[in-house]
Amino acid sequence: MEMTKAIVKENPRIEEIKELLEVAESREGLLTIFARCTVYYEGRAKSELGEGDRIIIIKPDGSFLIHQKKKREPVNWQPPGSKVKMEGNSLISIRRNPKETLKVDIIEAYAAVLFMAEDYEELTLTGSEAEMAELIFQNPNVIEEGFKPMFREKPIKHGIVDVLGVDREGNIVVLELKRRRADLHAVSQLKRYVDALKEEHGNKVRGILVAPSLTEGAKKLLEKLGLEFRKLEPPKKGKKKSSKQKTLDFLNDTVRITGASPPEAIQ
């Protein structure tokens, strides 16, 4: 296949998609497929997504994303390090640890694009919510004594958590950050994240809304839902050194101290 910066196939046959996948793997290309498909996931749980038009993105690092026409987050995904193969009309992404499989059965492919992307830059985060997260990582006690932040922008079932960590009792703590006055929407968003993590880890999950202030309606809803609020002003200026994120393996050490039961590892 003659290589150009981008190869576009309209109404590609399965054989052409397979060929593009092979080239993407060998040349570290970014493959995007627009198709009608069904999706099956099997791992720590099971899920099935019926027939529909979706965007399938396969990145050189193994990331595998399936987007619907709405919402920012993928409806299904696999993280970097996953391996992708094609069997018949099915794209299969396999994650080894923990063992998870995402299978996409292509019913009809409308287009496929192989993009030989060159991008060696790293994102420089500016903006007050990013700086709020940095401040929390450098000084966790602004949330509470004993809080340990572990992840920033952590993808979970229903979205992306701004900051995810644990408290001194071993509870998982979800932080939703807002640089301005928080409203009802922010509370509802936090509740969705907390509920999603409770499905996997039980009731040992807390949700904290972090903002300079909040509306009266947001305050009442927080109290009603059993969620919490911490007042925090965004830093005014200045860059700070990046804090390295750890895995949640440390939860096992926390459990030895507190005697709590460890939640399963969060993907």
Swiss-Prot record:
Keyword Protein biosynthesis belongs to the record: no
The UniProt record lists the keyword DNA-binding: yes
Record-linked InterPro entries: Endonuclease_NucS, NucS_C, NucS_N, NucS_N_sf, tRNA_endonuc-like_dom_sf
Enzyme class: hydrolase
GO CC list: cytoplasm
Subcellular location(s) per record: Cytoplasm
Keyword annotations of the record: Cytoplasm, DNA-binding, Endonuclease, Hydrolase, Nuclease
CDD domains to which the protein is assigned, alphabetical: NucS-like
Main location group: cytoplasm
Record Pfam families: NucS_C, NucS_N
Molecular function in Gene Ontology: DNA binding; single-stranded DNA endodeoxyribonuclease activity
Function of the molecule: Cleaves both 3' and 5' ssDNA extremities of branched DNA structures.
HAMAP family, alphabetized: NucS
Designated name of the protein: Endonuclease NucS
Organism: Pyrococcus furiosus (strain ATCC 43587 / DSM 3638 / JCM 8422 / Vc1)
